[in-house]
């Protein structure tokens, strides 16, 4: 990690991928459920090749009134494992399933349960984790048959072995995975001491770390956060509809009021097909348009071949040893940033807004420090949007390029080697690792190329002093000095 910038040790790139430690699930981690109904499990859309657990689960949904004769999809074995396949032609925005709120797993369900009292002060995601663990152990749980179809683990990197994680050597995803696992472990150990042990009768014995990671993985991969007034909800059957990069909208899940049984009304989780689908084809949704491949790997255990999903996070920091620390921090905070700022850079996209101004702020020093005076406080960010001085611009370019080269040196393979490996028959986890390595390096090379080009243009850039002189009418369009400047300095 290079020490850069005048006035202190600033490490702009900590190779950090997740922003903070609030692991309330991100956007819709979806897969949804279907509804059918008929006289037998086979007649409501299941197939003989489905496991007994899935068939039992389907029958339970039928008994709960979730599956009706009108349900246009069936559970089927597909390339991804299980999925939803159309029983008939489905038009775009057709409703394919509805699930009543009484079957949702969310903080309200926790609050209404026997453990609600002891979980009332917990972060919502932690209370739901405890609820999942407890309900899975109960023979009389409403969700017994739902838990029967859930996997013990997925290909999410939180479940990888040490040997498998070594394939991510040098990557941000490896560091993020280790950080997430350590964070979850610490939170769950606190839960054990503060909630489980003082209330042993409410929880299974023992509750292991594996139980915590199972529940965390279920929540991370299945929690849906885009319903009205619902930030954390798991909907049974939400893990059967699969993701497709071909779906480019996320507007497919709704909370509606409707019939939830023969004589009852309730809020319903309603899922619409985002695309027109022919009978026999699989129905897909888009899990999240904004997630990088690293986030997809961490949350769901897969990546897309789409290069635009490749990303790298630059972490910039104002060093406390910087002689202008207080002023720089004030400027950063006044413009929506903090002492540490994270910038996600995606392949084939422009640099994110705020990155260059923040870099220039961190690098600011020497004769450029006058911009930190209170006189400029309301206008400094506008000045930082443009090049300040040659020294400042050269310093930030050098810092970024050195950080990129340092990061690239941390991988144990080259892009060419990764691409050669991809031609082989890789298992799912190795394929993820190779794809992540390749993608991160592609973005790092892109960043390095951007700032290499900026270095080549340093002599052609217009800097603050030249712009100021032009504003005063003392500098021509070609940069020629006009008149006697002595009286202005």
UniProtKB/Swiss-Prot annotation:
CDD domains the UniProt entry points to: SET_RBCMT
Entry keyword set: Chloroplast, Methyltransferase, Plastid, S-adenosyl-L-methionine, Transferase, Transit peptide
Primary location group: plastid
Annotated phenotype, changing residue 281 to Q: No effect on substrate affinity, but reduced catalytic activity
InterPro entries to which the protein is assigned, alphabetical: Rubisco_LSMT_MeTrfase_plant, Rubisco_LSMT_subst-bd, Rubisco_LSMT_subst-bd_sf, SET_dom, SET_dom_sf, SET_RBCMT, SETD3_SETD6_MTase
Compartments, record wording: Plastid, Chloroplast
Keyword Methyltransferase belongs to the record: yes
SMART domains: SET
Domain of life: Eukaryota
Recorded family membership: Belongs to the class V-like SAM-binding methyltransferase superfamily. Plant protein-lysine LSMT methyltransferase family.
Function text: Methylates 'Lys-14' of the large subunit of RuBisCO. Can also use with lower efficiency chloroplastic fructose-bisphosphate aldolases and gamma-tocopherol methyltransferase as substrates, but not a cytosolic aldolase.
Designated name of the protein: Ribulose-1,5 bisphosphate carboxylase/oxygenase large subunit N-methyltransferase, chloroplastic
Organism classification: Eukaryota, Viridiplantae, Streptophyta, Embryophyta, Tracheophyta
């Amino acid at each position: 990690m290079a020490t850069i910038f005048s006035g202190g040790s600033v490490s702009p790139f900590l190779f950090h991928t997740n922003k903070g430690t609030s692991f309330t699930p991100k956007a819709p981690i979806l897969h949804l459920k279907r509804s059918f109904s008929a006289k037998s499990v086979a007649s409501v859309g299941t197939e003989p090749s489905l496991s007994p657990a899935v068939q039992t689960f389907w029958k339970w949904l039928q008994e709960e009134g979730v599956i009706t004769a009108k349900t246009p999809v069936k559970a089927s074995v597909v390339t991804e494992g299980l999925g939803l396949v159309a029983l008939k032609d489905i038009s775009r925005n057709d409703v394919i399933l509805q699930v009543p709120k009484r079957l949702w797993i969310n903080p309200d369900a926790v609050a209404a349960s026997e453990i609600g009292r002891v979980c009332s002060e917990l972060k919502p995601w932690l209370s739901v984790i405890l609820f999942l663990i407890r309900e899975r152990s109960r023979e009389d749980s409403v969700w017994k048959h739902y838990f029967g179809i859930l996997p013990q683990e997925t290909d999410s990197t939180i479940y990888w072995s040490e040997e498998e994680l070594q394939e991510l050597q040098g990557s941000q995803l490896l560091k993020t995975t280790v950080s997430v696992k350590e964070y979850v472990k610490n939170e769950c150990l606190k839960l054990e001491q503060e909630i489980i042990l003082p209330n042993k009768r409410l929880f299974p014995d023992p509750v292991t770390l594996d139980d915590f990671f199972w529940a965390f993985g279920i929540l991370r991969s299945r929690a849906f956060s885009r319903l009205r007034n619902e930030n954390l909800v798991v909907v049974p059957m939400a893990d059967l509809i699969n993701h497709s990069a071909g779906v480019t909208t996320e507007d497919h899940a709704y909370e509606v009021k409707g019939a939830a049984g023969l004589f009852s009304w309730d809020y319903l989780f309603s899922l619409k097909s985002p695309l027109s689908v022919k009978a026999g084809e699989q129905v897909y949704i888009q899990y999240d348009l904004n997630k990088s491949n690293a986030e997809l790997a961490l949350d769901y255990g897969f990546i897309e071949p789409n290069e635009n999903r490749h990303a790298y996070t630059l972490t910039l920091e104002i060093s406390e040893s910087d002689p202008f620390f207080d002023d720089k921090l004030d400027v950063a905070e006044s413009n929506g940033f903090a002492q540490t700022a994270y910038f996600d850079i995606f392949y084939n996209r422009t640099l994110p807004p705020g990155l260059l101004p923040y870099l220039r702020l961190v690098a600011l020093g020497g004769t450029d420090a006058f911009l930190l005076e209170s006189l400029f406080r309301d206008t400094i960010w506008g000045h930082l949007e443009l090049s300040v001085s040659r020294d400042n611009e050269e310093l930030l370019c050098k810092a970024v390029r050195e950080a990129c080269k340092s990061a690239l040196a941390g991988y144990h393979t080259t892009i060419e080697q990764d691409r050669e490996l991809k031609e082989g028959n890789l298992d799912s986890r190795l394929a993820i690792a190779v794809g992540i390595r390749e993608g991160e390096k592609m973005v790092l090379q892109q960043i390095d190329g951007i700032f290499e080009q900026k270095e080549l243009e340093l002599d052609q850039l217009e800097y603050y002093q030249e712009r100021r002189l032009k504003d005063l009418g003392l500098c021509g369009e070609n940069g020629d000095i006009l008149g006697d400047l002595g009286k202005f300095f």
